[in-house]
Regions:
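A short, polar/charged loop-to-alpha-helix boundary motif
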Residues: 113-127, 251-268
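Cys-nucleophile CN-hydrolase/nitrilase-fold catalytic domain and related Cys-dependent amidase chemistry
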Residues: 14, 22-103, 108-110, 176-207
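Active-site glycine-rich loop that binds ribose-phosphate moieties when present
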Residues: 121-136, 153-155
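Conserved hydrophobic/aromatic positions in well-ordered beta-strands
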Residues: 4, 99-101, 235, 255
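Cysteine/selenocysteine-centered motifs that mediate thiol-based redox chemistry or coordinate metal-sulfur cofactors
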Residues: 135-165, 174, 264-291
Length: 291
């Protein structure tokens, strides 16, 4: 299967951001991509740098304008697309939601982000209610997709549950970067850790991983912080964590990567982690901390 990934530097103009994304989707589809994954909250700026009630106006329903627009494109091109949207579920109830569009433009399923951060410049708890759909893979014409979002990528439990439910791919739309006050050495440690933990999920579950990050500098509209330099480095790994693609740290980019999903069977025969799990001994994993 051929997978397309797009990392983009967004501005405040949603119409322009969407237009540029859709042009890149067309390009990757023409290069043979069957599945195309976009970055987290891809329609606009990463608005969670500040707490502002007016920004809830950016949320949309699902189905809604984005699923209609990108759905028409999926239908035209015959590709599966993974969107990442600010969902308005009901009055006063909002989620950070990934939506999978089938080749015919229909909604194959959605995933609501489960782990919600609350850190300087990442004030997501102000905007998003934690997901309530669980860790459920989404069946599509290109395979069973284990969709997770950004902060979820640091939790091996999420990847494992997707794998145990038959996911054939692990997919992470992402918005992550460094602060201006971080030293170059610290910035590199963070990037390395981000890639390593997800490559570890690939190894531990013998599944390909697709991580798509945004790229470029976005200022903090409140001026409380110095903004975020999103570090790009969108990447794809194989079932043993091997890097198949690693995009630029500073530039917009896209790529088409070929994955062999049948290789999972072979690798799991070599490394039978699922066979050897001691499920009789893991009960305490559900506790916050074992005192």
């Amino acid at each position: 299967m051929k997978v397309g990934i797009i990392q983009q530097h967004n501005g405040a103009d949603h119409t322009d951001n969407i237009h540029r994304l859709q042009e890149r989707i067309r390009q990757l589809a023409h290069e043979g991509a069957e599945l195309i994954v976009l970055q987290e909250l891809h329609n606009g700026l990463y608005f969670c740098q500040t707490e502002d009630v007016a920004l809830f106006d950016q949320a949309e329903t699902i189905p809604g304008p984005s699923t209609e627009s990108f759905g028409a494109l999926a239908r035209e091109l015959g590709v599966v697309i993974v969107l990442s949207l600010f969902e308005k579920r009901a009055t006063g109830l909002y989620h950070n939601t990934a939506v999978v569009l089938e080749r015919d433009g229909s909604i194959a399923g959605r995933y609501r982000k489960m782990h919600i951060p609350d850190d300087p410049a990442y004030y997501e708890k102000f905007y998003f209610t934690p997901g309530d759909l669980g860790f459920e893979p989404i069946d599509t014409s290109v395979g069973r997709l284990g969709i997770l979002i950004c902060w979820d990528q640091w939790y091996p439990e999420a990847a494992r549950l997707m794998a145990l439910k038959g996911a054939e791919l692990l997919i992470y739309p992402t918005a992550i970067g460094t602060a201006a006050y971080d030293t170059p050495e610290e910035q590199q440690r963070q990037i390395d850790a981000w890639q390593l933990v997800q490559r570890g999920h690939a190894v531990a579950n013998n599944l390909p991983v697709i991580a798509v990050n945004r790229v470029g500098y976005e200022p903090d509209p409140s001026s409380v912080t110095e903004g975020i330099q999103f570090w790009g480095h969108s990447f794809v790994t194989g079932q043993q964590g091997e890097m198949l693609c690693d995009l630029s740290q500073t530039e917009e980019a896209g790529a088409v990567v070929e994955l062999d999903l049948e290789r999972t069977e072979l690798v799991r025969r070599w490394w039978p982690y699922l066979r050897d799990r001691r499920i009789d001994s893991y009960g305490e994993i559900t506790r916050r901390y074992i005192d």
